Amino acid sequence: LKRQTFDSSGQEVFFKYDGILYQKRLNLIGGFQAENVLMAAALVISLGSEPQDVFNVLHNLMTVRGRMELAASRANGASVFVDYAHTPDAIETAIKSLRPHVFGRIIAVIGAGGDRDQSKRPLMGLAASQNADVVIVTDDNPRSEDPAKIRQMIIKDLSRDAIHEYGDRAEAI
Protein backbone atom coordinates (compact mmCIF):
# COMPACT_ATOMS: atom_id res chain seq x y z
CA LEU A 1 0.00 0.00 0.00
CA LYS A 2 1.66 3.19 -1.19
CA ARG A 3 -0.98 5.85 -0.60
CA GLN A 4 -4.65 6.45 0.13
CA THR A 5 -6.95 9.39 -0.55
CA PHE A 6 -10.24 9.62 1.28
CA ASP A 7 -13.68 11.03 0.53
CA SER A 8 -17.06 10.79 2.20
CA SER A 9 -17.94 7.42 0.67
CA GLY A 10 -14.65 5.57 0.53
CA GLN A 11 -11.09 5.84 -0.67
CA GLU A 12 -8.72 5.54 -3.58
CA VAL A 13 -5.87 3.15 -2.87
CA PHE A 14 -2.53 3.15 -4.63
CA PHE A 15 -0.52 -0.04 -4.31
CA LYS A 16 2.24 -1.91 -6.09
CA TYR A 17 2.03 -5.51 -7.20
CA ASP A 18 4.71 -7.24 -9.24
CA GLY A 19 6.36 -3.90 -10.00
CA ILE A 20 3.17 -2.27 -11.32
CA LEU A 21 1.47 0.65 -9.55
CA TYR A 22 -2.31 0.27 -9.31
CA GLN A 23 -4.99 2.77 -8.36
CA LYS A 24 -8.30 1.24 -7.27
CA ARG A 25 -11.49 2.47 -5.64
CA LEU A 26 -12.69 1.01 -2.34
CA ASN A 27 -16.18 1.96 -1.22
CA LEU A 28 -15.14 1.27 2.36
CA ILE A 29 -14.65 3.71 5.23
CA GLY A 30 -11.45 3.57 7.28
CA GLY A 31 -7.85 3.34 6.23
CA PHE A 32 -7.50 -0.04 7.91
CA GLN A 33 -9.98 -1.43 5.37
CA ALA A 34 -7.41 -1.05 2.58
CA GLU A 35 -4.87 -3.06 4.52
CA ASN A 36 -7.42 -5.82 5.13
CA VAL A 37 -8.56 -5.84 1.49
CA LEU A 38 -5.03 -6.00 0.12
CA MET A 39 -4.14 -8.82 2.48
CA ALA A 40 -7.23 -10.75 1.36
CA ALA A 41 -6.37 -10.01 -2.29
CA ALA A 42 -2.86 -11.37 -1.76
CA LEU A 43 -4.30 -14.56 -0.30
CA VAL A 44 -6.70 -15.01 -3.23
CA ILE A 45 -3.86 -14.44 -5.71
CA SER A 46 -1.66 -16.93 -3.84
CA LEU A 47 -4.41 -19.52 -4.31
CA GLY A 48 -4.21 -19.12 -8.08
CA SER A 49 -6.51 -16.27 -9.10
CA GLU A 50 -5.29 -13.80 -11.69
CA PRO A 51 -4.19 -10.52 -10.06
CA GLN A 52 -6.02 -8.38 -12.63
CA ASP A 53 -9.27 -10.30 -11.99
CA VAL A 54 -8.91 -9.75 -8.25
CA PHE A 55 -8.04 -6.06 -8.54
CA ASN A 56 -10.91 -5.39 -10.95
CA VAL A 57 -13.56 -6.39 -8.41
CA LEU A 58 -12.23 -4.48 -5.39
CA HIS A 59 -14.70 -1.63 -5.98
CA ASN A 60 -17.57 -4.11 -5.45
CA LEU A 61 -16.58 -4.96 -1.88
CA MET A 62 -19.01 -3.95 0.85
CA THR A 63 -18.48 -3.59 4.56
CA VAL A 64 -19.73 -6.10 7.09
CA ARG A 65 -23.06 -5.02 8.59
CA GLY A 66 -22.48 -2.88 11.66
CA ARG A 67 -18.81 -2.18 10.96
CA MET A 68 -18.23 1.31 9.58
CA GLU A 69 -21.54 0.90 7.77
CA LEU A 70 -23.14 3.85 6.01
CA ALA A 71 -26.62 3.86 7.56
CA ALA A 72 -28.01 7.10 6.11
CA SER A 73 -27.20 10.34 4.37
CA ARG A 74 -28.80 13.47 5.74
CA ALA A 75 -30.35 16.25 3.63
CA ASN A 76 -27.48 18.54 4.70
CA GLY A 77 -24.95 16.11 3.23
CA ALA A 78 -23.88 14.56 6.54
CA SER A 79 -23.31 10.83 6.53
CA VAL A 80 -24.46 8.59 9.36
CA PHE A 81 -22.31 5.55 10.09
CA VAL A 82 -22.90 2.61 12.40
CA ASP A 83 -20.10 0.76 14.11
CA TYR A 84 -20.76 -1.65 16.94
CA ALA A 85 -17.57 -0.73 18.77
CA HIS A 86 -17.94 -1.81 22.38
CA THR A 87 -14.51 -1.30 23.91
CA PRO A 88 -12.51 1.90 24.46
CA ASP A 89 -9.93 0.89 21.83
CA ALA A 90 -12.63 0.02 19.29
CA ILE A 91 -14.39 3.35 19.84
CA GLU A 92 -11.13 5.25 19.41
CA THR A 93 -10.24 3.30 16.27
CA ALA A 94 -13.70 3.74 14.73
CA ILE A 95 -13.79 7.49 15.27
CA LYS A 96 -10.20 8.00 14.11
CA SER A 97 -10.98 5.92 11.02
CA LEU A 98 -13.85 8.23 10.16
CA ARG A 99 -11.87 11.45 10.52
CA PRO A 100 -10.24 11.48 7.04
CA HIS A 101 -13.66 10.90 5.44
CA VAL A 102 -15.43 13.71 7.30
CA PHE A 103 -15.46 17.33 6.18
CA GLY A 104 -17.20 18.67 9.28
CA ARG A 105 -17.84 17.55 12.82
CA ILE A 106 -17.97 13.99 14.06
CA ILE A 107 -20.88 13.41 16.41
CA ALA A 108 -20.56 10.07 18.20
CA VAL A 109 -23.58 8.37 19.76
CA ILE A 110 -22.41 5.80 22.30
CA GLY A 111 -23.79 3.62 25.05
CA ALA A 112 -22.71 0.65 27.12
CA GLY A 113 -24.61 -2.57 27.66
CA GLY A 114 -25.74 -3.50 31.13
CA ASP A 115 -24.42 -6.47 33.11
CA ARG A 116 -21.07 -6.17 31.36
CA ASP A 117 -17.62 -4.90 32.35
CA GLN A 118 -18.27 -1.68 34.26
CA SER A 119 -14.61 -0.64 34.37
CA LYS A 120 -14.53 0.09 30.64
CA ARG A 121 -17.47 2.53 30.70
CA PRO A 122 -15.55 5.68 31.71
CA LEU A 123 -12.80 4.70 29.27
CA MET A 124 -15.37 4.38 26.46
CA GLY A 125 -16.62 7.89 27.23
CA LEU A 126 -13.07 9.21 27.32
CA ALA A 127 -12.21 7.57 23.98
CA ALA A 128 -15.29 9.12 22.38
CA SER A 129 -14.73 12.57 23.90
CA GLN A 130 -11.06 12.68 22.86
CA ASN A 131 -11.79 11.74 19.25
CA ALA A 132 -15.25 13.09 18.38
CA ASP A 133 -16.34 16.72 18.29
CA VAL A 134 -19.61 15.98 20.08
CA VAL A 135 -20.57 12.93 22.14
CA ILE A 136 -24.12 11.82 22.78
CA VAL A 137 -24.45 9.19 25.50
CA THR A 138 -27.55 7.03 25.46
CA ASP A 139 -28.90 3.67 26.56
CA ASP A 140 -27.72 0.46 24.96
CA ASN A 141 -29.50 -2.61 26.32
CA PRO A 142 -29.17 -1.93 30.06
CA ARG A 143 -30.41 -5.45 30.95
CA SER A 144 -30.88 -5.56 34.74
CA GLU A 145 -28.93 -2.35 35.48
CA ASP A 146 -30.30 1.15 35.94
CA PRO A 147 -29.71 2.83 32.54
CA ALA A 148 -29.17 6.26 34.13
CA LYS A 149 -26.33 4.83 36.26
CA ILE A 150 -24.70 3.32 33.18
CA ARG A 151 -24.83 6.68 31.39
CA GLN A 152 -23.37 8.42 34.44
CA MET A 153 -20.49 5.95 34.56
CA ILE A 154 -19.69 6.76 30.93
CA ILE A 155 -19.69 10.54 31.42
CA LYS A 156 -18.54 10.92 35.03
CA ASP A 157 -14.99 12.09 34.23
CA LEU A 158 -15.76 14.09 31.09
CA SER A 159 -15.95 17.81 30.51
CA ARG A 160 -19.59 18.70 29.89
CA ASP A 161 -18.87 21.07 26.99
CA ALA A 162 -19.56 18.67 24.15
CA ILE A 163 -21.31 15.85 26.02
CA HIS A 164 -25.06 15.29 25.76
CA GLU A 165 -27.09 12.65 27.55
CA TYR A 166 -30.36 11.14 26.35
CA GLY A 167 -31.98 8.13 27.94
CA ASP A 168 -34.16 7.54 24.89
CA ARG A 169 -31.98 5.99 22.19
CA ALA A 170 -34.25 7.12 19.34
CA GLU A 171 -34.12 10.70 20.62
CA ALA A 172 -30.33 10.50 20.93
CA ILE A 173 -29.94 9.32 17.37
What kind of region is each of these model predictions?
Residues 1-4, 79, 173:
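Short, solvent-exposed polar/charged micro-motifs at secondary-structure junctions
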Residues 3, 83, 138:
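Conserved phosphate-donor/acceptor-positioning beta-strand/loop module used by diverse small-molecule
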Residues 15-17, 155:
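Short, positively charged
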Residues 124-173:
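C-terminal helical cap/extension that packs against the catalytic core
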